[in-house]
Amino acid sequence: MTTDNYKLTLQSLYETWAALTEFGASLTEDQWKTPTKCPGWSVQDNLSHLIGTERSLGGLGDTTHKATNLEHVKNPIGEMNEHQVDARRSLSGAAVLQEFNEITKLRKAFFDAAPENFFTDETMTPIGKAPMATFLQIRAMDCWVHEQDMRRALNIVGNQNSASAELTVDRLCRTLPIVVGKRAAAPEGSCVVIHITEPVVRKISITVVNGRATVVDTPSSKPRVGTALQGGWLGV
């Protein structure tokens, strides 16, 4: 991971934080309380989740509050997230946005002051041990996806043609060989082409060779399946 790469990732993260701030400032209290596609979560809850995550990662203290409704929670991480979210449900959307602005200001100052080895050294991440720069890519993706969850609930399109949108699509595209080869069980020698249209345009060709699905530059055979996806709400 080069210096330029992690700096670009940070820039993507900062841009998404700024987009969330601008978006949140435009919302009414009713809009903040609107349910989203995330089970049990409102627009406000999505932002509360991002606050809780950044507080935890920054060593800024976890809540002692315990949520009582855990019906939609599937695992220990989800339970931890729910405690953070539920702790802020009695607050106004404006108050939650203010906390988000404060915590992201602190996090940005920390990252901007960190030495290069902080980003290149390995640490534990949701995908195992990896450089901190990789973890930050996951954070940028998570923030952008939840921004889109919030926007979709209110039918307010925005921040789709952005660096974080491209980063998110590219990270999701890395998982497509697993989807094609294992989950869809595409047969040996077959080729699948996926074309993602605007605003983030990508064309991914995947061929199964020796039982393994791999991304290729040029399909080795006529595609067995071709599909086009509009990228607008792809992150949701």
Stretches found by the model and what they are:
Residues 21-42, 110-130:
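Helix-loop segments that flank and shape redox-cofactor active sites
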Residues 33-75, 125-180:
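Short, contiguous alpha-helical
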Residues 165-208:
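A glycine-rich beta-turn/hairpin centered on an aromatic-Pro dipeptide
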